[in-house]
């Protein structure tokens, strides 16, 4: 069974020096309302 959709988002970390098949996700604890 799939877990709840609460964790089904990824904010791209555009400032990360890594680029692995796309941008890595930012720490969700650092998300603010302006990110959405």
Curated annotation (Swiss-Prot):
It is an enzyme of class 3 (hydrolase). It comes from the Eukaryota. Coiled coil: none annotated. This is Peruvianin-1. The lineage of its organism: Eukaryota, Viridiplantae, Streptophyta, Embryophyta, Tracheophyta. Keywords: Hydrolase, Protease, Thiol protease. GO terms for biological process: proteolysis. Cysteine protease able to degrade azocasein and benzoyl-arginine-beta-naphtylamide (BANA) in vitro. Optimum pH is 5-6. Homohexamer, possibly consisting of a trimer of dimers. Belongs to the germin family. Glycosylated. It comes from Thevetia peruviana. Optimum temperature is 25-37 degrees Celsius. The keyword Protease applies. GO terms for molecular function: cysteine-type peptidase activity. Its EC number is 3.4.22.-.
